[in-house]
């Protein structure tokens, strides 16, 4: 009797690690990843973890991610307006979610970001002192 295997993927963590890995491999030739290609790579990477020799069978891949923010914000230093719904990150993530939905045995589970408490975080203390 075969063992059914479910795979859980932390979407944002996977994407960051994957892009970091690609940047190290390609160096200066790195280009932003096509969302369709990224969806394909996520699916195939998960399938590589199914061990057919141990009689494992894929039940489902659960891809957990958040919807990107559509909020309008201001840069902390210049107070210049920024519409997050028009950013390239927003478009890439929405497109990725659309491609992931079409993959067999893959379930997209969307959380949400609290738009009311979303704010800029400047981790570099030197830049923080310069800004404020």
What are these regions (language model features)?
Residues 1-132:
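Domain-level signal for Mg2+-assisted phosphodiester chemistry and nucleotide/NA-binding surfaces
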């Amino acid at each position: 009797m075969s063992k059914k295997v479910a795979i859980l993927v932390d979407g944002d963590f996977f994407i960051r690690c994957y892009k970091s890995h690609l940047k190290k491999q390609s160096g200066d030739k790195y280009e932003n990843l096509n969302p369709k290609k990224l969806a394909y790579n996520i699916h195939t990477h998960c399938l590589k973890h199914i061990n057919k020799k141990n009689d494992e069978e894929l039940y489902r891949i659960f891809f957990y991610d958040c919807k990107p923010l559509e909020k309008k914000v201001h840069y902390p230093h210049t107070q210049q307006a920024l519409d997050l719904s028009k950013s390239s990150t927003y478009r890439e993530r929405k497109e990725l979610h659309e491609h992931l939905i079409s993959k067999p045995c893959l379930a997209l589970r969307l959380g949400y970001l609290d738009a009311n408490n979303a704010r800029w975080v400047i981790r570099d203390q030197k830049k923080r002192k310069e800004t404020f």
